[in-house]
Amino acid sequence: MAEEERALLGPDGGDGGSAAPPRALPAVCDPSRLPHRLLVLALMCFLGFGSCFCYDNPAALQTQVQGDMKVNTARFMALYAWLGTVIFSIFVCVGQVIFALGALVNAFWLMEVGRFIFGIGGESLAVAQNTYAVSWFKGKELNLVFGLQLSMARIGSTVNMNIMGWIYSRVQDLLGHTGHATLGLTLLIGGITCLFSLACALILAYLDKRAEKLLCKEQGKTGEVIKLTDVKNFSLSLWLIFVICVCYYAAVFPFIGLGKVFFIEKFQFSSQEASAINSVVYIISAPMSPVFGILVDKVGKNIIWVLCAVITTLASHIMLAFTFWNPWIAMCLLGVAYSLLACALWPMVAFVVPEHQLGTAYGFMQSIQNLGLAVIAIAAGMILDTRGYLFLEVFFSACVSLSLVAVVMLYFVNHLTGGDLNWSAKKREKLQKVAANDLLYC
């Protein structure tokens, strides 16, 4: 490490009088250069792969879980109610193993405990992932980075949706019967992806510490520390972003969790067809998220993009609720809208809070989102058991409508307060250059 530090410091940075010039680090090993940052970005993306793969295990195996464990829809959706970087990745692995063991020993309560532990790690892992992103990438790069992270996460979800049913069938053929043992072994096989993400977390933690030392980055050098009392200083714009996040995702994740049976019952799809259309949101978001990230980077106007995404999502839910049109249309629209919203919404947090509060802000946003999802997931299961899918779709449409109201309010609040959330990319870049020059000559 000492040699690496001398390589970055240059001829004047070492002990005076060294005759031989220091050897420069290769680009891929130099944290100040693009190839190394791209390596870090790849690790960030894979950090959430295993978590997202295992997060949607219940959705991919809904009929098998309900049949093998003999639970109704409301009880099944409790698996989605406790959604909560090395420690967080370990939580994910332990939670997935306990979840699988619960099925092996035919104890649904143990499966719920496993999902609770998985949530502690999985959602804290998402906060760590977001904090890493804003630490390594700034300004116009941020939308693309969030898009790439979402893309890899959705690839994990898509692979899960399309392969877990097949794995269950192969395990069933191997054991010669269905039941809780078949389900448990299938879930253990799926948990292998968590070990892969844990390895990425370990490497990323090392690279981040190494970069801190090589680039002389000091934590908290301004004297400001991350603390929960930061919450009271959050602006109205940030709170509206929280509301948009909660209400929007409440109409996406619980819907996908219940979507397979919805398409079987309303549109008479086969189990395989239902799994395919239920995963199309994630299939679309995988390639489209980086594209939208670049688009938002180039254009700016984040609020307008969020508004378009919310309106499109509302239209797709209304189509699914009140028409018998080909559901592929609505689901493709939902996939496009979901990709666009994530690329435009999450980076806005970095525009409205100081850098030292980013960890607190993203953590609070994730916590509120998961509290909302916990309540909505249980409510959705109860509505489905008692009222059916039409009422459930109306409920999801109402959630998106609340998100739409919050977006409109955010637009006017941002306009009246002179905020920068809806600036064009050119204007933001110009003002950032002016601010940088002012700091240079201070």
Curated annotation (Swiss-Prot):
Cytoplasm found in the keyword field: no
Dileucine internalization motif (motif): residue ranges: 8-9
Listed Pfam families: MFS_1
Record membrane topology: Multi-pass membrane protein
Similarity remark: Belongs to the major facilitator superfamily.
Coiled coil: none
One GO location term (cellular component): lysosome
Designated gene of the protein: MFSD1
Reactions catalysed, as given in the entry: L-alpha-aminoacyl-L-arginine(out) = L-alpha-aminoacyl-L-arginine(in); L-arginyl-L-alpha-amino acid(out) = L-arginyl-L-alpha-amino acid(in); L-arginyl-glycine(out) = L-arginyl-glycine(in); L-alpha-aminoacyl-L-lysine(out) = L-alpha-aminoacyl-L-lysine(in)
Full protein name: Lysosomal dipeptide transporter MFSD1
Record remark on domains: The dileucine internalization motif is required for lysosomal localization.
Keyword field contains Membrane: yes
